[in-house]
Amino acid sequence: TPAVIEFVDIAGLVKGASKGEGLGNQFLANIREVDAIVHVVRCFEDPNVIHVDGSVDPLRDIETINLELIFSDIEILERRIAKTSKGAFNDKSLAKEVEILKAIKAHLEEGNLAKSFPCEDDDQRAFINSLNLLTWKPVIFAANVNEDHLEDDGASNPYVQKVREFAAANDSQVF
């Protein structure tokens, strides 16, 4: 059987999506089903193409998306903590699970992505993977550049360089 990659184009996410703004809840439900996220980031200026925030700033745009994903993950963790805590009094494994869930939640509340959570071992990594957190998923950034920056792979584009630096610091790739 040949390998298949299916891309699902999901409408852009806006600030407040985790609270239902725009198509937020639908977007977050759709993205939860994917194995990896390809985040298209605007890295060009054109006065004919209006930016929702009024200016081009790819790091701000990445941060907006990441915060919405973090907020959604925190909500998922809060529900899981509430559900699991009920049985944790009589079950040491559930108590340990609650402890891990609370630690991940605290990590997210500091503005960190779940994938940067320091796992103790493979079992803990597998448990976190089973939570299907959005900020645990691998991310590839697609730098959307104008035609002038295609030949040099964006090397002369300062926006692309900022995205590359961010990606390198966050275990992600850019193309």
Predicted regions, residues:
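Conserved ASCE/P-loop NTPase catalytic core
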Residues: 4-22, 30, 63-70, 74-107
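C-terminal-of-GTPase-core extension/linker across diverse P-loop GTPases
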Residues: 83-175
